[in-house]
Amino acid sequence: MSYLRASRTSSNLSLAKKPSKTRKKLQARKEWDSSVNDLTVFRATNEELEHRREIHRSKNQWLARWELQNKANYKQSEKENSTQFENSRLALMKEILSDQYLMNDVLERSDRALAVVKDLFGDAPRRHTGFPNVTMAPSCDLETSRAPIVRKKDPPTQLSILSESVMDSQAINEVDKSLSRSEYSDSEAEVSISIQPNMKAERVQQLLTGEGPKSEAFITPHKSEGDPSQTQCALNATTAVNRVKVRRTEEESPKPEESDSIIGRVLNPHGKANKRISLKGKKKRTTNQSQTKDFSTFKASERDLTTSNQSSLGLLNSMIMEVEQDLAEYERQTGREVLSAPPAHGLTGFTLSLVSSLKRVVSYLKESDLLLQREVRERQNLQGELVEQRLMLDALTAEILSLKEGGNIHENHSQTKQCPEVDGDKLTSITQEAKTFPGLNGETCRTSADCGLSKVNQFMDSQDVQDTDEKHSRLGVSKDEFGARLYPQGRPAEEPRLASALPSHVFQQAVLLSPPRQKTVGNLSSHSAVPKRAANRLPSPPADLMTAPVEIEWPESKLFQRSINYKNTAALIERGTMVPGQENSKHVYSSAQGSERVNQHPTESTKEVQGLEIGESQINPLQNEDLVSQMQQLALQNAALKAQLEQIHFSPEGNAPEEAAAEQLHNPEPATDTPARAALVPVSLEMRIAELNRQSAEARNKLLKLIEQQKQSIVVSPTLSPITPQGRRTGSSLDTTPLSSCSTSGRRSSGASNKSESISTSVGSLRSASTGRRSQAANDRGEGWFALSAHIS
């Protein structure tokens, strides 16, 4: 296709129609506007402009402004947060990568230190690499031929020796030069071969391991460093080769030493601070010094280093040996197995010994800590058990003391149960003496147990006067009548009046002014043996009096009157035993009568108790001495009556001579009225005998009642002793001691115990007069214990 337009022919042009021309219509001209020159008419006013602004103002203007403000604030906060986040991120990265940074710093410092330490002693040989250009023979076999260049090993330096001593423990002791040379030549020979680049690594290895050491014996040179151009140059040492060698030497950087030399320098830092010099100056100095050194100076420096190193290691070894000896001694003391460590040589052996010793010490510390904890636990357990055992011991001690106290009380009560049953004839003189002391009739016992014990003790100790009373009752002559015969001047009659003139509170119950002393069982048992003998020696009363019922009157209390049949009672007393049935019946009857009396006269017994308490606080020691003298005189009178009555014998045929003699003794007057008096003497004697028998029976009955009441009080409610085993009466024991049974039995026998109290008091006075225990009474008064025995002894 062609882009050339074909020319039109003339024929075509002629045939074409010519376009017709259209005329434009002429527009009418507008009129001229003269206002064009003054356009201010069309200027908008301020109101129109404001209206236009209001019309075209956006409806979201405030929202858009708020969004823009928020965007600005967000960008600002984002910028602040980004800075904070960046700081925290950097801190975190530093914390994470700090170890790596520190490691890099340590490595850099170690590299710098190694660069300085490389030639610390200034005796390291300088190696200069040769560049051989050798034309090999055509028939040369590389496997059988020697290497073209064999670099001998460097002479030993101080640093290399130190490294070998660290790596090999036997190197320190090898000082011999020949051994050291052979050691270096055999074990640590370094062969440096410089061959052509096309030699294979296998061939080089074969040369190093096979033929090289066998064929060549390396000899340590006498000088540590020679002229590099003469000693270690290439075979074809041309000028170009020397220039290349010098350039490469300058370009080489200092290579670090081997690992063994580094370890040796770190472990033996002697002289490091004094010999640290820059690498340049050290190289220059060593170059100048090494040219003038000979082999002898090298040997001396080597020997000094060996001795100094050996001395430091020897010190460490000696110290570790001392530690091991201490550990062995400790093991022997504690009974453990002694572990003998092999002898350590060199620094490696020292480290091994140190680690093993530390391990043993740590194990022993752990074991001792465990033992200490176990001992602490055992001690705590033992302390708890000790507290429990102490509590148990305290409880057992309290129980034993209470049982002992109860046993003492029970034994005292059992002793009181064995009170002897005294015959009436024995009590005749006691009754007469009791009549002379009217102050004793109205008193009552505070507790039945105390009354019973005091009566039993007084009867037991009055055995020395019972013979006189026995003879008086057998003869039928009263002591008053017989005393009038012996003392016609009236002296014996005045002494009973003196006794009766004494106040009634003298013979009342004892007052406790200080803690009493507890008597032992032996004292009670010694006293209890006397009434048994006395009961066997008591004579029986007359048979005519035993069958006659007697009316007993109680003038002291005026509480009751009772008729007692003395036949059965005297028979029982004479046998010394009582039928169980009768004993129980008497026991019940007496207790019933005692309760009946208490119900009938409650105020009278209360008055008596109040009088007793008032009288106990008015005891005078001077009256005690008067009473003692009076009791002694009564004892003498009884002895005289006994001697006189033994001479009088009554018979139905001839009573006149004996009666006349008795009358003359009684009244020594002229014998004008002798026949009339002879007829009156038998009658008066019989009346007196009957009266004495009646009184003895009355006293016997009262004693039996007292014994029954004592048994009843023991059976019903045994009292608790207010006296502690140490012999001290505490205030709590005085307040809390139960006395219900004692007070009850005392109220039951308020009337019956008055007479018995007077009898027991008189018997106790006779006993004290016969024995004469003034020292015991003085001790009792000194201690504040004013018992009845203290008043009459």
Curated annotation (Swiss-Prot):
Residues 718-739, 754-778 have a biased composition (Polar residues). It comes from the Eukaryota. Residues 740-753 have a biased composition (Low complexity). Residues 18-27 have a biased composition (Basic residues). Residues 1-29, 519-542, 718-783 are annotated as: Disordered. The keyword 4Fe-4S does not apply. Pfam families: SPICE (PF15678). Residues 312-405, 622-712 form a coiled coil. Keywords: Cell cycle, Cell division, Coiled coil, Cytoplasm, Cytoskeleton, Mitosis. GO terms for biological process: cell division; metaphase chromosome alignment; mitotic spindle assembly; regulation of centriole replication. It is found in: Cytoplasm, Cytoskeleton, Microtubule organizing center, Centrosome, Centriole; Cytoplasm, Cytoskeleton, Spindle. Its main location: cytoplasm. GO terms for cellular component: centriole; centrosome; cytoplasm; spindle. The keyword Transferase does not apply. Regulator required for centriole duplication. This is Spindle and centriole-associated protein 1. It comes from Xenopus laevis.
